[in-house]
C-alpha cells in the first residue's frame, strides 16, 4: 500500500481522491464527563520535509487534541516562500513517520500541500492547519521567505484558521535539536485557537526560544520586528570557467524592540504574532490619495 502514487493534475479547481481506509477519521469523541462532542481535524505540514523531527514532535504533541492528518513535502523547501505550482503535475504518496504514524508526502511546496488537502485530496473537513516545527526562527520579514509561514498563509487565504510554529535556537547549536518545549507551546496555542477561533483572514506566527520549558518567562502577543539581513553574493567558477552564484552571508540579526517578536525571544518569551493577508500600508493610504494623480 505504501508504494501507491496519487497523480494530481495541476490546475484542477476541484478534485477528489478516496483514501479510505488509509486515514480513518473519528467523527465523535467524548469529553471527560462522557458527553459526546465533535472531534476536531487538524492538518499538519511543514517546509523541512515529511521526515523532519520537528514535524514528528508537533504531530505527537497534538495527537490527543484532534484527529491529525499529515500532508507535507517529500523534501526540504526551506525559504521557498509562497508557492503555487501550476505548470507541472503534483504527486502524492503514502508514507510513515518515524513512529509509524501514517502520512502523505507531496513533491509540491508547503503551500501546495495545504491547497491539495483543502481542495479535496483529504475527504474530511479540516478545522485547523498547523505548520512546523521549523528548526529556525521566523521573525520579522522572515515570514515572506518562510515555507513554514506561507503554508499557514495558504490556509488563511482559504478561510481556515492556521498556526505556524518555529523554534529559535542560538547560532552554533550542534547536534539534534530538542523540540519538546516548542511542541508543548504549540499544543498550548492550538488549544486556545480551538477554543476561541480566529478571524477569517488571520493566522498566527509562533516563535519559541530554545530553552527548557521551566525557563520560558511567558507568552507575549507581539508585532513583527525589524530583521537585519547580511546577505552576500558569492561568485564561483565551474570547471569550464563559467561563473555561477550563491546567495550566502551571515545569519540575520534583528532589532529587539519592546513589543516585537524579536524582542520577546531575546527576553526569553514565546512570541505569538497575529498576521493577516491585507498588506495595504494603511498609514499611507489617505496621504497618497491626496497626490495629484490626475495632473497633466
Language model segments and positions:
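Hydrophobic alpha-helical signal peptides and transmembrane signal-/tail-anchor segments
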Residues: 5-23
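Short, Lys/Arg-enriched N-terminal segments with co-localized hydrophobic residues
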Residues: 22, 26-39
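A cross-family phosphate/adenosyl-ligand binding-site feature
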Residues: 42, 53-125
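Alpha-helix C-terminal capping segments
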Residues: 117-123, 150-161
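Glycine/threonine-rich flexible loop motifs
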Residues: 137-146
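Glycine-rich phosphate/pyrophosphate-binding loops
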Residues: 156-178
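Electrostatically charged, flexible surface regions
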Residues: 177-296
Amino acid at each position: 500500500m505504501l508504494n501507491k502514487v496519487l497523480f494530481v493534475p495541476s490546475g484542477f479547481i476541484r478534485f477528489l481522491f478516496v483514501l479510505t481506509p488509509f486515514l480513518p477519521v473519528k467523527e465523535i469523541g467524548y469529553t471527560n464527563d462522557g458527553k459526546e462532542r465533535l472531534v476536531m481535524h487538524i492538518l499538519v505540514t511543514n517546509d523541512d520535509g515529511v521526515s523532519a523531527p520537528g514535524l514528528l514532535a508537533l504531530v505527537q504533541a497534538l495527537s490527543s487534541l484532534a484527529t491529525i492528518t499529515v500532508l507535507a513535502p517529500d523534501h526540504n523547501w526551506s525559504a521557498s516562500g509562497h508557492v503555487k505550482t501550476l505548470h507541472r503535475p503534483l504527486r502524492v504518496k503514502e508514507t510513515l513517520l518515524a513512529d509509524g504514524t501514517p502520512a502523505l508526502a507531496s513533491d509540491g511546496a508547503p503551500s501546495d500541500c495545504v491547497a491539495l488537502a483543502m481542495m479535496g485530496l483529504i475527504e474530511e473537513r479540516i478545522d485547523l492547519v498547523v505548520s512546523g516545527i521549523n528548526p529556525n526562527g521566523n521573525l520579522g520579514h522572515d515570514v515572506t521567505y518562510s515555507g513554514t509561514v506561507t503554508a499557514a498563509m495558504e490556509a488563511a487565504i482559504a478561510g481556515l484558521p492556521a498556526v505556524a510554529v518555529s523554534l529559535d535556537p542560538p547560532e552554533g547549536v550542534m547536534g539534534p535539536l530538542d523540540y519538546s518545549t516548542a511542541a508543548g507551546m504549540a499544543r498550548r496555542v492550538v488549544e486556545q485557537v480551538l477554543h476561541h477561533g480566529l478571524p477569517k483572514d488571520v493566522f498566527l506566527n509562533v516563535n519559541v526560544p530554545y530553552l527548557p520549558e521551566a525557563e520560558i518567562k511567558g507568552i507575549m502577543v507581539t508585532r513583527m520586528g525589524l530583521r537585519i539581513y547580511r546577505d552576500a553574493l558569492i561568485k564561483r567558477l565551474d570547471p569550464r570557467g563559467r561563473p555561477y552564484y550563491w546567495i550566502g552571508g551571515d545569519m540575520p540579526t534583528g532589532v529587539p524592540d519592546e513589543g516585537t517578536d524579536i524582542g520577546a525571544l531575546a527576553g526569553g518569551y514565546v512570541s505569538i504574532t497575529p498576521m493577516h493577508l491585507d498588506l495595504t500600508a494603511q498609514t499611507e493610504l489617505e496621504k497618497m490619495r491626496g497626490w495629484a494623480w490626475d495632473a497633466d
